Amino acid sequence: MDNNYKVDEQKKGLHFNIYNYIWGGLIILFLAFLYRINCIYPYVTDDFDYSFIYGETTRLEGIHDIFVSQARHYMEWSGRYIVHFLAQLMLSMDKAVFNILNVIHYAGLSTLICLLSTKKIHLHIWLLILLTLWCIMPQPGATVFWLTGSFNYIWAAGMVIAFTVCLLSQYRPLNITALFLAIPAGNTHESLVMGVFVSLVLYSILTKKKNKLHIIALLLFFAGVLSNILAPGTFQRLQTAGVQGDSGIQALCIKCLVSVYKIIKGIFSTSCDWGVQVCVVLFIITSVYLIRKVLNKKQTTTDILALCFLFGALCNVCMILPTGLTYGRVLFGFCFLSYLAFCVAFLSKLLLLPRYLNLIILTSTVVLCSIPCINAYATVSIFAHRMKYIESCAKKGEKTIRDLPISEQITHRYVDTSCMFPNENQNHFAALYFNTGEFSVLSPRIYQIMEEHSQAMQKMPPDEWVVTNENHVIYCLKEKPKKSEILVDAFGSTSSLDKYLPQFIKNLHKPGRRHTIINLFTMHGKYFATWDMQAPTGKLIIHYNEKTQPQEVYFNIEEQRCSK
């Protein structure tokens, strides 16, 4: 009898070890996938900006430069000095350092969520979190893989969860650690930390926590929140987004209602990031489950914590309503706290299920998550190839670069498509980063776009018309320019270009405005000029260097920086 019992116990232990090896192998495989994605994901948009001292064209060369940059950044653009300091620190190093640290941080964040949900590390639950967290976050390309974006979102979440775990721990040393994490965590991201703060305060009230360390840590966390929200740069950024402090309560309420409408409409739109839709479903499921438990008076302290996180998720939505911004990653705070509430409410229940049900859940999760993994790798690979192509063209001296047709396969979920067609950041700082002259990128469908717009164009004088596309003004010229060189002074005169460009484009030449290179081409016998209105000011010298191709004539443009 005893021998049979020992054999049964040995078999159980053997099965346990086998499953642990499987889970461990899948964890290593997934982390290797994340590392590979990080390696091929290129620098884009803000990565170029933050490689320089803010407001200057001087490359970062040390910690002192980062402090100078962040002091100016805090006053002029954003109060998130912690995450942006870390981003600039990483950008001053080789990207290989970030590639490794980002994977380690993601694994650490998943571990903290596991601890918050089940109090211990269980490999199969840790694997579930690793697979699903990045997958259902809005725009993981911008919130997880993109260097600057990752610090603003997933790293911010990591610091906030580290603070939360330490704060709620029963061990005094961790409570003391929470005091040191409080201000940095509170400063990370305003649309995330406000919801977390409300959640933790509400949880403290409902569970009647009176620990002095707990209260002090919350006050320090709120101080970090205020250091972000009340930063001079935060108000400047809000004004840029169209939020005016003196616009009146009525106008602000209307704007909030419009934002609510946009969010609800966006959730049901086919173009909505499906990660946001999944998080909305998780929010609803968790809310129904917890409300039923509360009504039946069967709630536990864990259920109360999950309910507080749900309330915090709604607070995060309220934080963004006045801005009018409702696109994918703006909803990161809502999505993350909804996901966290779901994990806290349900993951511990998996430990009570039979082994075969856990196997079914894990197998289904692995299969389902492999699909976005494949899509992410394919999309990021295409995007990386595109950025290398643009860099190589810029280094060859090309001023106007027609994008690769394959770029149209890139979707916004796994890549930040706001950087697809260069604006001020790309045209200026990318050129500085690549150590090339200014350049502009046109859509691979520029000629098809012109044809599509030709029937619904903005009418100008006879035989002239203007359309706008991808930040470019496209203007149909009356005739082919005759001079071999035309000088355009961004601070006043337009010399020979007067007869070819309409007055509203010529008026763009004013001090403080930003413009870019003009690209001239022909299509079906007509001549067109394209103008990107967001690139740096300066003197534009247009050299005609015709390369005759079917229905196309390109004119290369060079720019000379103006010292004014």
Where do the language-model regions lie?
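Intrinsically disordered, polar/acidic, low-complexity terminal segments
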Residues: 3-7, 19-77, 81, 91-111, ...
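Membrane-interface junctions at the ends of membrane-embedded or membrane-associated helices
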Residues: 9-18, 167-177, 204-215, 291-302, ...
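Alpha-helical transmembrane segments
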Residues: 20-33, 126-131, 180, 217-222
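Residue-level signature of transmembrane alpha-helical entry/exit and packing/kink sites
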Residues: 23, 99, 174-178, 213, ...
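Transmembrane catalytic cores of multi-pass membrane glycosyltransferases
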Residues: 35-96, 100, 147, 182-310, ...
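Membrane-interface micro-motifs in multi-pass membrane enzymes
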Residues: 80, 125-168, 189, 276-279, ...
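Transmembrane alpha-helical segments
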Residues: 106-117, 159-168, 197-205, 283-291, ...
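C-terminal structural cap/anchor segments
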Residues: 326-379, 385
